[in-house]
């Protein structure tokens, strides 16, 4: 049996239970204390919030009062000034407007902070008081509920204690009865054993005596056994009874124990959480959230109100405008700034002569004085113009200084954890930088220089004004027909144009023609002032009836040409826009809808004479064309209107010049943009029109061009017929590369796209269609197809007629070496083409020449494996044939001459002949013989053939030169024959390479350069080929073709001697 010492005694069990209960009771007490402490913290927090917002309300109120005092202090000064009377009409200067808005913002902030203080006191603080009262009341009720739950829990624990003691008592009685029962059983066993032993020890003496003894002993044993059995039975019954009671008590104890554990778990896990959440915190956080959101709403609305005021101030700062302020100032003090009445002649003592006397003997003196004034004025104007340019440059420097963007102080408001870093950031402001002193010194020095130049300019202008007035009066008095003033020169020019019945005056047509050819991309055209000396020279030439801008010369300053055009319109005696329609036109500007504005402007302008409308239509079409290049020339319609507004439409006297000029500029801008909708079309109003794509044809037909012979006239008529035929039959082309148009006129397409070509618009462009849209197509990005020989070119009309009138050329034969599969006798083909070029008669008139590109003679003579040949080189004014001629070799021949042949064959006259049906067949036949009949030849024989053919061609060319009575044309053979003997050896290759991939050596001598007349006339010199690479994969052109520019064909470059070769119009290729 197990020793009883190993089991806990009742006292130990009771002591442990009591200790556990005491711990629970102490924990419950601490829970109440913790909740009490939490309630006190909430009350204290709410009290602190009330005190905080009460103090903040006081601060906001004080801040509001201070802001109001600040605003009233300065508003009182503003009310006392005269500017206040204009405030109702909003007729205040922009800085004053900023100042007024700043004061209004201060007053607005004052009102907002007063409102904020009132919200703190009457809204937010009462909310916190209410939350505090509700929290305390709810906590008391929550504490009562918690105390009741704790009492119930302690009651359960006491019940468990009672059940446990009952279980211990019954279990002890059961154990005691069990021990007694076991003791009775032991006695019974002991008694039975004792009886057996006594019977064994006794020996019987006589039968009678033995029987008596046995009877007595049996009687004694029976009585003792019965007693033991009765005692055993009693103890057995007692044990059974006590055992049953112990089992029942244990069951009750286990049930009570489980219930107690469940109650404890429920209290700690559920009841406490419910008491805190649903009793103590009931509505506390929600009420606090509402109160704080009220604070946030007030602050955010305050911030929004402040931002609205700051936005108004920012808008006023953006509208700071010196011009508008000047206009308002003059309007406010109109009596002060209006010009005084003119001084009238006051006769003395009855002298009524109020005009200059130009009779003898003072006439000669007046003439001499006028000449002196004229000379003096020319000098002064030039000097004053230079001073003006210097002054404007200095003014721009000052504006750059004062407009530097150094106002961003966002770095000073970066978040920082320490106040020291904030202070260091704030200390490094703009005003504390060391460079501010130097900057201020530079600014003051620049300002001093500017005012010096301004004073000098104004003094010079005053002197010019006085001398000009005297000169004009003398000029008027003397009655001379010619004046040096630009305005009178333009009037005389206008009279001559009207007398000659010309719709567009010469000066207008010539200047626009020159600018449209050479100056569409000139930056600042019409804005930058030109040279006064050159302006006077051009003006004098027009006065004499000459056209100084005729031909293809480009040695004039573009700004000077633009200045001449502006001065012409400025000096018209009868301006294009008469003053009697000034108010009607200005009224149209007030319309917001651009289309309606154009309609009304059209109605006003239709009352003008037809000659004036024709000139307007021509001029504004040109200005619209010019504005389309604004990305390069920086002259959009608005900038052009600023430059042309004062010249075309002057503000009548009695009107404010500043305010009216802005409306004039807007009017001119509208006419430039909507010129097609404003002016009548050619059907409604007959007369010349400005043509963008083919304007040179109009120039060629001008009466100011050179005389056109009857032969040329016949050719022109026939050329027009052929051109129309070409336009009626579109040509199909395939795109070689992807192209993205840079303007609305240029078409975009993908590689392999099918294109329809109508006609050649220029050297680099076709007019065609793609996906139903008409526009310009770059020639270098397409492959033109034809049904006859796969290649077609649209040449100029003149060249086609010349080809028809010439007999077919002799077929060219060539011999090739076995080692040169793609090479022919280059010299034969070259000389044959030179003969064609020499036989072309020159014309004295200005013609429009279109260049054929890579599908001319050069491409027909080269291998089809290199499609880029002849498509990417520019002919020079001094070709060097010796660098491209083949040199004999023992086992190989050079084909570098193909590049030279291709370049020369691209001359407009030569390639146009090759495009005609007769010559095309001849070229095809010659090509088949020279390139397909490959017979092995000795290199020495080839060299001898070249020399013999060259000598023969030289004799023929010299004979033609002697017979020709036209102007000498530079002889290509004579110019290139001598370099032929000393030309460097060019490494041959098996096939020609595209000029796009050809590397060029540096010229030993600089090539003749043409003046920068136009992008289409730029030429580069032929250079020796350094190395000819193998045929590379076809790539897009190195540079995009430039927009359409129409070059001339009869001009020579300045500075080129008579031996230079004719300029080619080829510009499609870049090396």
Curated annotation (Swiss-Prot):
Origin organism lineage: Eukaryota, Metazoa, Chordata, Craniata, Vertebrata
Gene: Srgap2
A GO CC annotation given for this chain: cytosol
Domain Rho-GAP: 489-679
Localisation: Cell membrane; Cell projection, Dendritic spine; Postsynaptic density; Postsynaptic cell membrane
Limits of the SH3 domain: 728-787
Superkingdom in the source lineage: Eukaryota
InterPro entries noted in UniProt: AH/BAR_dom_sf, F_BAR, FCH_dom, Rho_GTPase_activation_prot, RhoGAP_dom, SH3-like_dom_sf, SH3_domain, SLIT-ROBO_RhoGAP
Phosphoserine sites (modified residues): 206, 427, 500, 691, 695, 724, 795, 916, 930, 990, 994, 1013, 1027
Protein name, entry field: SLIT-ROBO Rho GTPase-activating protein 2
